[in-house]
Amino acid sequence: MAVSARLRTTAEDTSIAKSTQDPIGDTEISVANAKGSSDSNIKNSPGGNSVGQESELEHVPEEDDSGDKEADHEDSETATAKKRKAQPLKNPKKSLKRGRVPAPLNLSDSNTNTHGGNIKDGNLASSNSAHFPPVANQNVKSAPAQVTQHSKFQPRVQYLGKASSRQSIQVNNSSNSYGKPHMPSAGIMSAMNPYMPMNRYIMSPYYNPYGIPPPHMLNKPIMTPYVSYPYPMGPRTSIPYAMQGGNARPYEENEYSASNYRNKRVNDSYDSPLSGTASTGKTRRSEEGSRNSSVGSSANAGPTQQRADLRPADMIPAEEYHFERDALLSANTKARSASTSTSTSTSTNRDRSSWHEAEPNKDEEEGTDLAIEDGAVPTPTFTTFQRTSQPQQQSPSLLQGEIRLSSHIFAFEFPLSSSNVDKKMFMSICNKVWNESKELTKKSSSHHRTGK
């Protein structure tokens, strides 16, 4: 304190002692006591020194107040810092933000057991475990949570067999031929009907009498319509009958129709040599025709010569024609197998009955079915792989197909999921088919070597 010794009193000494002990709370009290004592001393002092002493006492208390406040503030800060260090931190697990997050799900335990139980206690068994065993015992793993579509089909590759060299490259054409009549190839038709006329220039330059037609002619007729010899085929027109002129006649009333021609043959049969009313020229001509047919030279006769002999006035009688044709068939069937002769004779009988019924379309279908049933035409189309004409109804989630490699045919199917996965699955199937075909080729080659 900057107060002179002569101005100190007993009251000031007590206030200073208290301020040293409690500087925070007793600062104002000491200042007030000092002011009161100074005022009393000024009143008792002489008038000359009153002004200077008053000014000195007013300036000293302001400096003491600011210094004490700064010291008290520093002491309070140090005390609070010590209290914070001494106080322990709160547990972060009990914070409000973490309390809002739910506990993680135990998917591994819940997926391996189909029965409800208390997961916290660790007891996953239930009262139904005796009746329904858990899935974990059956070695079945459930799909992950992100998989929502489960397929019922599994990828499969099946070996169908080995295709012959004469089989068509288009193995399964059921989708292309659906709703269309079946048209056999040229070799099959010629084998079933050996005397059917055929235009040899219809498929030039792709014509091959013993092979398969080109791809653009598979579903098209490759031969002229079948005409029962010696019936001539009348011209057909696409103009409706109502728009034709007065001279035009419908095809049914034409002189080339089957009914009128059959009536002419019946009328001519009365002049046959069997009835005894035929002329000598007709008898000689019939004998020459039968002699030529027995040798087989009539089969090589040109179409112009045959048509010239079939004039309306010189028609061959029905009985004589049947006799000649039977002789021709018997001569030609000697060089054929037993099965082919049986099918040919049966088809001939059916053709003979169909002439009297005037149903050529039905006759052709019956003859074809008969040849297939008897096995007279052992072609690979009917014997090797029999394909159904009905289209296969595929599931929208299942892809099916066939792969032919080195005359080996493989069928495959796998479920559809996505474009990338489907492509990888197909490529893996192609790799498997490639490896299997190589193994089959090696086995077949080794088998041929051991057989030789």
Curated annotation (Swiss-Prot):
Cellular-component GO terms for this entry: nucleus; Ste12p-Dig1p-Dig2p complex; Tec1p-Ste12p-Dig1p complex
Bias (Low complexity): 331-348, 378-395
Annotated Polar residues bias: 12-22, 35-53, 107-116, 124-145, 269-281, 291-307
Modification type Phosphoserine: residues: 45, 126, 142, 272, 275, 330, 395, 428
Acidic residues bias (residue ranges): 61-77, 362-372
Entry-annotated residues carrying Phosphothreonine: 379
The entry's keywords: Nucleus, Phosphoprotein
Region feature (Disordered): 1-145, 262-311, 331-395
Recorded GO MF terms: transcription corepressor activity
Modification after translation: Phosphorylated by FUS3 and KSS1, in a pheromone-stimulated manner. Phosphorylation reduces the affinity for STE12.
Region (Interaction with FUS3 and KSS1), start-end ranges: 212-452
Single biological process term from Gene Ontology: cellular response to pheromone
Basic and acidic residues: compositionally biased ranges: 349-361
Basic residues biased stretches: 81-100
Location of this chain's protein in the cell: Nucleus
Job of this protein: DIG1 and DIG2 are negative regulators of the filamentation and pheromone induced mating program. DIG1 and DIG2 inhibit the transcriptional activity of STE12 by direct protein-protein interaction. DIG1 colocalizes to promoters with STE12 and redistributes with it during induction of filamentation (by butanol) or mating (by pheromone) to program specific genes, but binding of DIG1 to STE12 is reduced by pheromone treatment.
Note: Present with 5000 molecules/cell in log phase SD medium (5480 according to TAP-tag study).
Subunit structure, as described in the record: Forms a complex with DIG2, STE12 and either FUS3 or KSS1. The interaction of FUS3 with STE12 depends on the presence of both DIG1 and DIG2. STE12 is lost from FUS3/DIG1/DIG2 complex after pheromone treatment. DIG1 and DIG2 have also been reported to interact with CLN1 and CLN2.
Protein name: Down-regulator of invasive growth 1
Organism name: Saccharomyces cerevisiae (strain ATCC 204508 / S288c) (Baker's yeast)
